[in-house]
Amino acid sequence: MAATTAPNPLAAYRFLLRATRIAFQGDFTTLHAARAEARKQFDQHRQQGVDTPMRIQHAMETAEILRTNVVQGVKISGDGEEADRYASILVMRRFRGEYEGEDERREKEREARGGCELRIHEHIERGDNDSIKTAGKNERVKVAVGKACSNTQ
């Protein structure tokens, strides 16, 4: 029998730090706060416990969300210059990618009225909403009364 290896806390911590670097690149304040929180959580639970694998799994999932779903935004003033950074935006898992490939006219209009510019990096999960639109339209399977669920008609 092959022995299962326990999740490595150090690897999870490093993965989380890398994810914060990717998600909060260019925003030192948020990057520092996220890393301080990660350090605090790992220091509080330094001793091995029954829930250690669960906490490591939580750290890995948090890192994955930071890498794939958090986008930094920069507020653009009316004259096209950066005004100030604002809080990160948690985007939907099926991000449409509509900020890529906009025509110049729409881009100029958005800058003229003051908008925001998103730093969308290569790790951001993109998709279309087609799967969401068709989610409730699956054919329903009819099960005969009195038969096991595996027997369908």
Curated annotation (Swiss-Prot):
InterPro entries named among the record's database cross-references: Complex1_LYR_LYRM7 (IPR045298), MZM1/LYRM7 (IPR050435)
**Superkingdom as given in the UniProt entry:** Eukaryota
| Keywords from the UniProt entry | Chaperone, Mitochondrion, Transit peptide
Question: An example of a Gene Ontology BP annotation on this entry?
Answer: mitochondrial respiratory chain complex III assembly
Q: Which GO terms describe its cellular component?
A: mitochondrial matrix
- Where's it found, cell-wise? Mitochondrion matrix
GO molecular function ontology, one term from the record = protein folding chaperone
Transit peptide location: 1-56
The record's comment on protein family reads: Belongs to the complex I LYR family. MZM1 subfamily.
User: Quaternary structure per UniProt?
Assistant: Interacts with RIP1.
Q: What does this protein do?
A: Assembly factor required for Rieske Fe-S protein RIP1 incorporation into the cytochrome b-c1 (CIII) complex. Functions as a chaperone, binding to this subunit within the mitochondrial matrix and stabilizing it prior to its translocation and insertion into the late CIII dimeric intermediate within the mitochondrial inner membrane. Modulates the mitochondrial matrix zinc pool.
Protein name per the record: Mitochondrial zinc maintenance protein 1, mitochondrial
Organism, by scientific name, is Ajellomyces capsulatus (strain NAm1 / WU24)
